[in-house]
A protein has these predicted regions:
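A short coil-to-beta-strand element that immediately follows conserved catalytic motifs
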Residues: 17-18, 99-108
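Conserved Nudix-box catalytic region and its N-terminal flanking loop in Nudix hydrolases
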Residues: 52-95
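Acidic, metal-coordinating catalytic segment for phosphate/diphosphate chemistry
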Residues: 1-48
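Long C-terminal interaction/binding lobes of large macromolecular proteins
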Residues: 128, 141-186
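Active-site-adjacent beta-strand/loop module that shapes the phosphate/pyrophosphate-binding cleft
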Residues: 110-138, 144, 161-162
């Protein structure tokens, strides 16, 4: 998402400036006219490793319509205002796959610096008929030991979940200069 070029409070052109904060001097986007600061804090993103309890524990990976290549990844989404992370990931799983979540457990919290996000990843034991939302174009079911993890963002959550199941993760190799979503995971 592009940065706003003008102050969101008064409309003056923004620029970077240094100011004393807790911990010392910090340079941020600040408005010289009104002092408003653009904090640029990371966005929390929810992710689910979906284990299908009614399909022998297979893992569901899906392909987003906006992604290049044929990458299949975890179900992810943003929290809504007033929603807990657990409620948010249950909603995202239902919205994007039509699956019902039986239980959730936290896998971990992961940085995704390139996107300025913090990923809160859950294991979701789920069941039901899979019907994808329009933002997803395909899905694949994998036995846990057949999943190839990607070396970024949610791929580390998948690897941690596999290890918790006694499965040593297998990692995909990315060509130089390629992001995980630009490669074929089929």
């Amino acid at each position: 998402m592009a940065e706003a070029k003008f102050c969101l409070s008064c409309g003056t052109a923004r620029g970077s400036s240094a100011a004393e904060e807790d911990g010392g001097t910090k340079t941020r986007l600040r408005c010289a006219a009104c002092g408003w600061t653009h904090w640029n804090n990371p966005t929390p993103v929810l992710a689910a490793v979906i284990e299908l309890v009614d399909r022998d524990g297979q893992v569901l990976l899906a392909r987003n319509a906006a992604w290049p290549g044929k990458f299949f990844g975890l179900i992810t989404g943003f929290m809504e205002a007033g929603e807990t992370p657990e409620d948010g990931i249950r909603r995202e799983v239902a919205e994007e796959t039509s699956l019902s979540v039986d239980s959730l457990s936290l896998i971990g919290v992961y940085e995704f610096l390139r996107m300025n996000q913090v990923i809160i990843a859950y294991h979701a034991a789920a069941r039901g008929e899979i019907r994808l939302s329009p933002e997803l174009v395909d899905y694949r079911l994998f036995a846990p030991e057949k999943v190839r993890c990607w070396p970024a963002g949610t791929g580390r959550a998948m690897a941690d979940w596999l290890r918790s199941r006694g499965v040593e993760p297998q990692w995909m190799e990315l060509p130089p200069g390629k992001r995980a979503i630009e490669v074929d995971t089929e």
